[in-house]
Amino acid sequence: MVLLIHILAFCGGFVIMSMELLGGRILAPYFGSGVYVWGSIITVFMLSLSLGYLQGGRLSVNNPSLQRFAAIFALGAVLLYPLILFAEPVMEFIFLRIEDPRYGSLMASAFLFILPTVILGMISPYSVRLLVTKVEESGQVAGTLYFVSTLGSAIGTLMTSFYFILWFEVNTVLTLLSVVLLMVAGVAMLAARQPSESR
């Protein structure tokens, strides 16, 4: 189970940063790609992740399980689809009503990215709780998991900026990210059904 949770944490970090980079491409047609757009995206992601860390920590207190962990990934996958289906009308609606692109991009970022990012932010604290069995090991467990998650974020950043954006349309990449989340959720759910002795 330890290896599986590390793989899940890696995938979570990968998807978060890939989605953040795609945010710039999503907002660009309406709000440009200036520093204020990236400032809006980064602000929304940081605030959303902080809420996700808080909620993930709270959720992990009572009866943490691999099934619930899998459900976080599945919900994150589902919440990527509104980006594919509704990003254009949401941005057009905001663009026509907020003249200042700074606040327009901030509002659009909030509407589009808060929910999936909050959910994905729950992964890190929940994964720590699943692996901590002794209080004295908690620091080492957390450090290793955050290393793996951040490594996933770094690779997700490079793969998205160097390759995915060049090879695929934004919606195609979002669909692939959603599929990855669903696949790892399925693997986690199957693992949760195995007898504890075999994990």
Place the predicted regions along the sequence by residue.
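Alpha-helical transmembrane segments of multi-pass membrane proteins
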Residues: M1-R199
